[in-house]
């Protein structure tokens, strides 16, 4: 089964407000939207010692299992369900449990490098980059990693200076050139509202298209005796 899906990619630096924008879109669309966090597709490093996993560079494109992500997005766009991996940020390993995700009208891929893979970009209908001042982003990163993910402040700061900041400059910020829309100041309410209106318009158009397609199919196959 193929369903008309509208795929959105939301990228930006750590702490830029990507998740907020993604959640506002999915909440606005409701059950017709699926959120795919890129973080869930980190390579599984469970075969390595904890210290090595803790010091790995998670902001480099090679940290992600792109082939699996491509396969999953393609499946969703083809109307097939997927088993999405889950990631343990405290232990830096992929969890054994997976979450079954069904295809929906809107698919939202969110993550620092959501716009970095050429094949994935070709699957997306709308490319968004969330841009926020670096000072604001590091404060949000600290709050998220220390409060939400249970990490030590010193480790978070060391990681930011050694990998997060240089990787942002080298790999993440350049993906802005792929963006159809750049949202300034993180979750800028005006920009997000306009974005939500666009998504709603796209989904309404897809619903109408699907209804016309179903009617055409019924007319073509109806053969009264």
Swiss-Prot record:
Its EC number is 2.7.1.48. Keywords: ATP-binding, Cytoplasm, Kinase, Nucleotide-binding, Transferase. The keyword Transferase applies. Pathway: Pyrimidine metabolism; CTP biosynthesis via salvage pathway; CTP from cytidine: step 1/3; Pyrimidine metabolism; UMP biosynthesis via salvage pathway; UMP from uridine: step 1/1. Its main location: cytoplasm. It catalyses: uridine + ATP = UMP + ADP + H(+); cytidine + ATP = CMP + ADP + H(+). It is found in: Cytoplasm. GO terms for molecular function: ATP binding; cytidine kinase activity; uridine kinase activity. Signal peptide: none annotated. GO terms for cellular component: cytoplasm. One of its GO terms (biological process) is UMP salvage. It comes from the Archaea. ATP binds at residues 12-19. It is an enzyme of class 2 (transferase). Belongs to the uridine kinase family. HAMAP family: Uridine_kinase. This is Uridine kinase. It comes from Halobacterium salinarum (strain ATCC 700922 / JCM 11081 / NRC-1) (Halobacterium halobium). The gene is udk.
